[in-house]
Regions:
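A short, flexible helix-boundary coil/loop motif
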Residues: 1-20, 31, 42, 132-148, ...
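An internal, acidic/charged active-site-proximal segment
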Residues: 143-223
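Active-site-proximal, Lys/Arg-enriched surface segment
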Residues: 59-135
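Gly/serine-rich nucleotide phosphate-binding loop at the start of the catalytic core
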Residues: 1-61, 65
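Alpha-helix C-cap/termination motif
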Residues: 34, 46, 80, 167, ...
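A common structural microfeature
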Residues: 28, 37-40, 53, 82-87, ...
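Electropositive, glycine- and tryptophan-enriched low-complexity nucleic-acid-binding patches
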Residues: 54-58, 110-171
Length: 223
């Protein structure tokens, strides 16, 4: 039964990969099965990638995955027991030396650059995932997309949350870190059918230190 379900899922995902779907599908398998890859060309050595190494670059250039349909396919794999727990985050892909890479932006980073500033130059990505278990690190990304130079993390996250919630049968709980504990995110998510839990960091005038509180978005209750 599990094998049949896996085969059904793979066949459905294959249909949503757009152009160059054969090479893209095999590239996906190669990524899953390759423990260490130091370049894209290394993935062409995987036994499941039955093409020559240039096909990897052609697949990435030509493929146009149908993100909405893939998200709907992922949602079908979610448990229907209880309310789904979603987690959103913004991560940086540091590319400070890739001067020819388009759409590089200034991103927050825990590793400082020259001048001891906690930033890097690269690309930012916004992810919203389903967290299915009480313990462990496994999660199912429902949307994972680059934040373009004309967007910001707040706009992207709110849009992604809206897209996910419109396709969920049950009102979810979504959790976010302090980057999203701000008025713009509160306003942009006020009409989304989800209960939002985020941290707010603020300077206490009386204690002179950073404090964290929790806020439930759509009901506007502070805890």
């Amino acid at each position: 039964m599990k094998l049949a379900k896996l085969q059904e899922f793979r066949q459905a995902a294959y249909k949503h990969l757009g152009r160059a779907h054969d090479a893209t599908f095999e590239l996906t398998d190669a990524i899953l099965l390759t423990r260490n890859a130091y370049s894209l060309a290394d993935l062409s050595l995987s036994p499941v990638f039955r093409r020559k190494w240039p096909s990897i670059y052609e697949a990435l250039q030509d493929s146009r995955p149908q993100r909405q349909k893939l998200m709907q396919l992922y949602i079908k794999q979610m448990s229907t027991q209880g309310r789904p727990l979603l987690a959103g985050d913004h991560t940086a892909w540091s590319r400070p030396d890739a001067v020819t890479l388009q759409e590089r932006t200034i991103e927050h980073s825990s590793v400082t650059i020259a001048g001891n500033k906690p930033i890097t130059i690269g690309q930012g990505y916004s992810t919203i995932a389903w967290i299915p278990e009480d313990s462990g690190s496994w999660a199912l990304p429902l949307r994972h997309e680059r934040i373009t130079s004309w967007e910001n993390p707040i706009q992207k996250a709110a849009w992604q949350l809206q897209q996910v919630c419109e396709n969920l049968p049950t009102r979810p709980i979504s959790v976010w870190d302090s980057e999203y504990g701000c008025a713009p995110f509160v306003l942009k998510t006020s009409n989304i059918k989800a209960d939002i839990l985020s941290t707010f960091a603020f300077k206490s005038l009386f204690m002179g230190r950073t404090t964290t509180i929790f806020w439930q978005g759509t009901t506007q209750e502070a805890w």
